[in-house]
Amino acid sequence: MANKNILFIEPGYKNKYPPLGLMKIASYHGPHGKKDNLKFIKGEDRSVLNQHWDRIYVTSLFSFEWKNISKSIDFALEIAQGQASKVFAGGIAVSLMHKAFLDETKWRGVRFIKGLLKKSPSESMQLDEFEGELYANDHSKFPIEDHIPDYEILDQIDYDYPVADAYFAYASRGCTRKCSFCGVPKLEGGLLSLIHI
């Protein structure tokens, strides 16, 4: 089922680091995965409005960027012509403020993904096989979280990340502590050792 059109949206805020979650999802969909057609935009690039998109992903960063994140989700719905089932949103703010996103009535039907994509792609993305959703039958044991980020999608935008010449890898995820100021345990769960770097 290759050659589906997949759009990735990063809100128009300033940030140092590239959207690693979106980049892992791009790896799942891209040339080394499902072989779909990928497009990455930052902010509201209106050139994508007159195209058909099979799925639209929106990332989020910090909760104080609610306004920019909201604009991007609204824009994704505009692109999808109101078909909320095509829109998926995740990231830090969505994970930490999950209920606030779910409670927003204008976004009913949008899939708000909380935390890491550690389960099978169909389960992590809350896909419904009965509805015949794209890749809903992908119950593979290779979670999206374990994909190598697709750095090539960053070439599609005119934004320079201050740490653009770096590659990010994790030796572990999560944390055993529950510091009041930190969201890591809520986002990633308890401490989990990963591959050796």
Regions found by a protein language model. Name each.
Residues 4-5, 10-14, 18-165:
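Glycine-rich beta-alpha loop elements in corrinoid/cobalamin-binding modules
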Residues 176-185:
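Local cysteine-cluster metal-coordination motifs and their immediate loop/turn environment
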Residues 184-193:
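Iron-sulfur (Fe-S) cluster-binding segments and ferredoxin-like electron-carrier domains
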Residues 195-197:
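Conserved small/polar residues in nucleotide/adenosyl-binding loops
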Residues 171-175:
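Short metal-coordination and nucleic-acid-contact micro-motifs, chiefly zinc-binding Cys/His arrays
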